[in-house]
Amino acid sequence: MAKYLIVGPSWVGDMVMAQSLFITLKQRDEEAIIDVIGPNWSSPILARMPEVRNSITLPTGHGEWGISTRRKLGHSLRSEHYDHAIVIPRSWKSALVPFFAKVTHRIGFTGEQRYILLNERRKLDKSILNQTVKRFTSLGLPNELAYPPMDIPLPALRVDSDNQKKLFQQHNLSNRPAIALMAGAEFGPSKQWPIAYFHELAKSAIEAGYQVWVLGGPKDQNDGEAIISHLGEFAVNLCGKTQLVDAIDLLAIAEKAVSNDSGLMHIAAAVGTEVHGIYGSTSELFTPPLTSNKTIHNLHLECSPCFKRTCPLEHTNCQNQLTPDMIIRTVLTQ
């Protein structure tokens, strides 16, 4: 029985995709114990992964060094006597906790002069490990099986039926089939399909007999209101009114989910919802929704993907030229 300490990623979608690594470890050793270090927001997601024993909160913000905090956490974990540590992020600071915890075997990709902190450093061959999920999963495999990993398991989050019932009552949701819209893009506006287009999609969905839920965080509230404006009782703006764990349960009920390339898109994929992923500045070849039940919407313009937070050409044609009719036609006819 091996005992693993995983240093998880900092983004919602990446943490969902990391479940493929956790499942891989369990497939290779069903008695394996897996604990995951992550940001505070990640605990509810990790609690829905049956492979994970404990989520360990790292009380530092994204981008903060927090060396003393990492040292203190590492020292507190020494009594766990972990056999292996897998450090998913490539930053120097990400490898500190396993080092201070005196984990015997510490593996991660080469980067930021981590020679002492890691005692197995893997080369990141981007031509072979050409997807995020491949990179994560490869770290849980022997070197000879890692380039690339084969038969990668798909994320599958647990759903809480009691919480689903509570959410329906709390938000007075309809019994109509639901389409979830996720219009936020935490990374930047270059990943965001226009809000006016989401409004047109919502209008058509309601006319076709659906209810529409707009999901997102507090920052998305105003956009959510714009999407449901004048659409009546079957359009509900839930942005900022639910927790991340609630989004898991709501998306599991929704018949379809239409989303920018975002963390919520990956959650929808991990609960089996039919996913319509909108791409432009990013690529579905690198971070696809990990499900067979998906449709990708991407114009594949010459300037795309740029992987920039804002459009360097100042037109965002990869989003603006993907018209509502193009999406509506596919979403409502499948």
Feature locations, PLM:
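Catalytic machinery of carbohydrate-active enzymes
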Residues: 1-334
